[in-house]
Amino acid sequence: MEYKPNGHETIKSALFVDFDNVFSGLRKLDEDAAKHFATNPGRWLAWLERGLRKETSSPDTFHERSVLIRRCYLNPIAFGKYRRYFTQNAFSISDCPPLTQQGKNSTDIHMALDILDTLGHPTRFDEFIIFSGDSDFTPVLLRLRAYDRRTLIMTGAAAAQSYKAASDLVINGHRFIAEGLTGLKDEESDNVKSFAQSVKRLSVENGLRSLSARLPNFTTT
């Protein structure tokens, strides 16, 4: 952890996103929110780094995150159209196509292996962030705890109590929508209103010019 003046602390974090799980969970709560999660990762990433500050016992100290590793795991067949939004925000993408007729893929295995590999990274990460409601990651969280690493999970929809208990901080889908995605819908609405006002103003100006051109040109002597 890097300490800065005035009680500021920066947590070095590694982020792992189970896209299919989170997108499906958010879609059950709010389809628009799921779309915003998929198409504007930069927004909620900024919230993770600066907006979501870890609670601390000292009122003069707060933590900011520096997400140094960003990895997203998705099914390219079902969700390939969202891939570019994550690459544009410096995510490494792991394609995890379905392996069975039921649509089961290998996301959980790939994520678990990458998380455990990151434990041995030259950069000692203070915190591991897992975006998934899959309780199969419970043993991974317990391993991270044994190595004295802070953990944060974002569950999307409902998650098992044992899974949530294994993490230091739990963000459910409702809080993520309210805080991490807040303002996105309002911004879209404001953009639409602004565009409509511009069109209306342009129409009025064009109408005035047309009327002025048709009026006789009176001159005084």
How would you describe each model-predicted region?
Residues 1-110, 120, 145, 150-152:
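Domain-level signal for Mg2+-assisted phosphodiester chemistry and nucleotide/NA-binding surfaces
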Residues 78-215:
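Nuclease catalytic cores that cleave nucleic-acid phosphodiester bonds
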Residues 219-221:
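Accessory DNA-binding and partner-docking regions appended to nucleic-acid-acting proteins
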